Curated annotation (Swiss-Prot):
This is Na(+)-translocating NADH-quinone reductase subunit F. The keyword Cell inner membrane applies. One of its GO terms (molecular function) is electron transfer activity. InterPro entries: 2Fe-2S_ferredoxin-like_sf, 2Fe-2S_ferredoxin-type, Beta-grasp_dom_sf, Cbr1-like_FAD-bd_dom, FAD-bd_FR_type, Flavoprot_Pyr_Nucl_cyt_Rdtase, FNR_nucleotide-bd, NqrF. NQR complex catalyzes the reduction of ubiquinone-1 to ubiquinol by two successive reactions, coupled with the transport of Na(+) ions from the cytoplasm to the periplasm. The first step is catalyzed by NqrF, which accepts electrons from NADH and reduces ubiquinone-1 to ubisemiquinone by a one-electron transfer pathway. Its cofactor is [2Fe-2S] cluster; FAD. The chain crosses the membrane at residues 3-23. The gene is nqrF. It is found in: Cell inner membrane. It comes from Histophilus somni (strain 129Pt) (Haemophilus somnus). Residues 129-269 form the FAD-binding FR-type domain. It is a single-pass membrane protein.
């Protein structure tokens, strides 16, 4: 009897808790359809079921907000302005959004829960962003850890990007074995030295990452990227390798790849000021895009120079391209500095870190370095060193333009 009574009471308690949870859920979560009004334009409003995050809700309706980290809350790019609804800002957003911006309604769309109807504001250029399924034309090594991925846009389509812009690449769950990579023997030294062939990248979820374009707008029908593979650092070999870079390095001719874009803000100013481009590693990509666009499409007569840092001659690429541009344009020169030239390089050019080379061989004696515009993209250490050097020369922030996607 006591056992039966105990079971009955336990059942009643469980049922009561279930009813309570369902009641609370009905009050706290809107399970019906909601409306997101955009830019006070009735034609842009979208209706959808409640649930999920704002970033994904917009994407499901064909509105693609930039998110280099794929919605993880780490890149801080997916900022939108929420003027009504959306709830309170979360602590995870405050490292990317200032207190003033938070008061004005700015949020990370990947962190905003879609529970109720809301009103938001988006930049108009967002509505020009599209998705394409592209075909891999080639995926060749340009340096030890850098591949040039060349993609074919679907016939009749065009990615209307500006030089310095970027696209996002998507990848479904996958497993990549580094031993399967197609890498020419000339680049094997470091791969063998650190036994990088032993690594495997296993991804169990859909991922998205952003990459700056190396192509420029006149190169119709294709998208070119310079992708540096994110291998585990030698001092910490147990760190997982980069998910998207590993995936991209595994791509072969004929493979299909989904991209979205265009995005960007690393655009050239429309002035007559001198342009100084500074790059390193995969930061070559937006440098090539900008310089080709200025000299080949715009036929610019602005004075410009390009300063690129590499470890050795093996890590130099697009040399013939920039030599050609220099020969064809009196207003353009380019220089390479090797930080660790090999004996067989027989190198008689600049050596050392690129920020020091730029300063000692040009800016130190420049009559007005503060009047130049500086466009840079490279490893974080390079970027920091260049910015400090420019600040010491009195260059204002408005003349220092940085692309954080390279390196």
């Amino acid at each position: 009897m006591e056992i039966t009574l105990g079971i009955a009471m336990f059942t009643v308690i469980v049922l009561a808790l279930a009813v309570l949870i369902l009641f609370a859920k009905s009050k706290l979560v809107n399970s019906g359809d909601i409306t997101i009004e955009i830019n006070d334009d009735p034609g842009k409003a979208i209706n959808l079921p409640a649930g999920g995050k704002l970033l994904g809700a917009l994407a499901n309706k064909g509105i693609f907000v930039s998110s280099a980290c794929g919605g993880g809350g780490s890149c801080g790019q997916c900022i939108v302005k929420v003027t009504e609804g959306g709830g309170d800002i979360l602590p995870t957003e405050l490292s990317h959004i200032s207190k003033r911006e938070a008061k004005e309604g700015y949020r990370l769309s990947c962190q905003v829960n879609v529970k109720n109807s809301m009103k938001i504001e988006l930049p108009e250029e967002v509505f020009g962003v599209k998705k394409w399924e592209c075909t891999v034309i080639s995926n060749d090594n340009k340096a030890t850890f850098i591949k040039e991925l060349k993609l074919q846009i679907p016939e009749g389509e065009e990615v209307p990007f500006r030089a310095g812009g970027y696209i996002q690449i998507e990848a479904e769950p996958h497993t990549v074995h580094y031993k399967d990579f197609d890498i020419p023997k000339e680049y094997h030294e470091d791969w063998d030295k650190f036994d990088l062939w032993r690594y495997t990248s296993k991804v169990d979820e859909h991922i998205i990452r952003a990459y700056s374009m190396a192509s420029y707008p006149e190169e119709k029908g294709i998208i070119m990227l310079n992708v540096r593979i994110a291998t585990p650092p030698p001092r910490n070999p147990d760190v997982p390798p980069g998910q998207m870079s590993s995936y991209i390095w595994s791509l072969k001719e004929g493979d299909k790849v989904t991209i979205s874009g265009p995005f960007g803000e690393f655009f050239a100013k429309e002035t007559d000021n001198e342009m100084v481009f500074i790059g390193g590693g995969a930061g070559m990509a937006p440098m090539r895009s900008h310089i080709f666009d200025q000299l080949k499409r715009l036929k610019s007569k602005r004075k410009m120079s390009f300063w690129y840092g590499a470890r050795s001659k093996r890590e130099m690429f697009y040399v013939e391209d920039f030599d050609m541009l220099q020969a064809e344009n009196d207003n353009f020169v380019w220089h390479v500095a090797l930080s660790d030239p090999l004996p067989e390089d027989d190198w008689d050019g600049y050596t050392g870190f690129i920020h020091n080379v730029l300063y000692e061989n040009y800016l130190k004696n420049h009559e007005a370095p503060e009047d130049c515009e500086y466009y840079m993209c490279g490893p974080p250490v390079m970027n920091a060193a260049v910015i400090k050097m420019l600040k010491d020369l009195g260059v204002e922030d408005e003349n220092i333009l940085l692309d954080d996607f390279g390196g």
